[in-house]
Amino acid sequence: MKLAYLYKKMALTSLISAVIFSLISCKEQSANIGSQAPDLAVFNLQGQKIELQQFAGKKLLLNFWSETCGICIVELKQLQQLAEKYPDNLQILAINIDGERGDTQKSAVKNQLILPIVKDQLNITAERYQLVGTPTSFVLDPTGKILYKFEGLISESKLLALFKDP
């Protein structure tokens, strides 16, 4: 009886240690200009996991946003217009950071957003990218290296330059 209790206690301790270790290792990745972009821990609105390698070979803009951020919605609409005008030059991935408290699907419909939208449900991706506020965007080259980081609304001239420069 005592032996079974001891085994259960050891198993629980091992499980807790593994969870803590995996959470700590999640934070080890960081987003620095010139370095490889950290992995994503996001799911699309249909519940499918989305990974950076799905965008390999393409220039990609990761846009972190919140439903309660009016400027974020303005920027997403600008990104959407430019993505429609220049569909082959820059891929967009809109990463919602509201977690459980937000209804991202409802917000996308309300704001007529048709960009690829994903949820960072546990804010693991936001931590890996050292997010301070929204909107924040990262531009990755086709190999996944971070070229630029923008905190706040990106000016129209910078956005246009990003889309026009393949």
Say what each PLM segment does.
Residues 52-70:
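Short active-site neighborhood of thiol/selenol oxidoreductases, capturing the structured segment around
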Residues 2-14:
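Bacterial N-terminal signal peptides that target proteins for export
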Residues 13-22:
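Bacterial N-terminal signal peptides
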Residues 63, 94, 138-139:
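Hydrophobic beta-strand core positions in alpha/beta domains
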Residues 73-111, 121-127:
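Structural microenvironment flanking redox-active thiols in thiol-disulfide oxidoreductases
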Residues 107-113, 121-164:
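Thiol/disulfide oxidoreductase modules built on the thioredoxin-like
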Residues 26-52:
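N-terminal "domain-start" segment that seeds a small globular fold
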